[in-house]
């Protein structure tokens, strides 16, 4: 991955910059002297008072704008969940590694041992340097030519997870469990030997020589940045329920609910161009209606009215910078389901089309994604523009398919489009859009 752009620090925010008129940085700005002349500043002048100020603000170390501090003022509920996770780790209730999948991911618990979230550290992603799963290491060693997905920005899966949640909230789809970028540290995470030795050394120094140990900025293991997704209860793999529904067809009203929820999944996956959507990484929750005449097994939850909901998890391999055009096509596996052969409903059109047709909404969505993605130290503005170009093309195709009364299956059969933007020289705040079709096709179009 070519990462030639300047690094963007996560410390930066709008408060770090002053967009007003700058004060003169030298005495001559206030006295009109010529360059190189010596000026005596009177006592108490602004220039002299600034000279006596330290170059670095000593209070900044205690500033709440700590890059490793999890603050979510816009979402108090999510912030409280993170507080529970941090409190549990302090009490010795550590996250538990999930042994499924190809990356390091963890069930995070509260003080009572209840699972409250799923944490996926950046450096333990499928292609991260500290991935505890040996399968990707073996693939990189034995078959480097097929290693990775060249259409994706490597090691940004945690941003993709959070970005999918952002798109879900903006479009009001409500099928992605809330996901944000957080910092967590735990003994059960996969750290390098150096980090563990340093942590033990600092703890030993604090115990033996407290005066020395108190000088350390941090005693424990370094926090890891990653995505934290709220855990959803009562859901099972979609593949489980879809097979069940084939044997025991749903009532008409419940089947309608499933279709509407399925269409929301299609909208999300298509816009973010999810390259890893099988029937085993989206979930279904089905609460069966109360029925005293028949005895059903424990998989069925008895309620008064049938309720069916979907949860789109595992969104870490989305937001590509180009459409797949090498070995694999990374298709949407839901396209083979019978629900994909039904025309988009009027409900999903009314929910999505007004937003997608609004240029201001699309611009706001791009800016929100930019603010999220630029948190990564390896953020590349050029790569981000390519990701947005793909997303714009997906939005264009989706809008056209809904207007034309097409089905999700017909949607995925439309030619891939890229919509690039460029500044208009004569107009400072105007942009021109260039639409192009991808002619190159992957070698395996079905895989």
Swiss-Prot record:
Lipidation (S-palmitoyl cysteine): 142-143, 145-146
Ranges for region Activation loop: 312-332
Entry binding sites for ATP: 99-105, 120, 229-232, 314
Domain called PI3K/PI4K catalytic: residue spans: 92-421
The keyword GTP-binding is assigned to this record: no
Compositionally biased spans, kind Basic and acidic residues: 48-77
Catalytic loop: annotated segments: 273-281
Location of the region described as G-loop in the Swiss-Prot/TrEMBL record: 98-104
The protein's name: Phosphatidylinositol 4-kinase type 2-alpha
Biological source species: Danio rerio
The encoding gene: pi4k2a
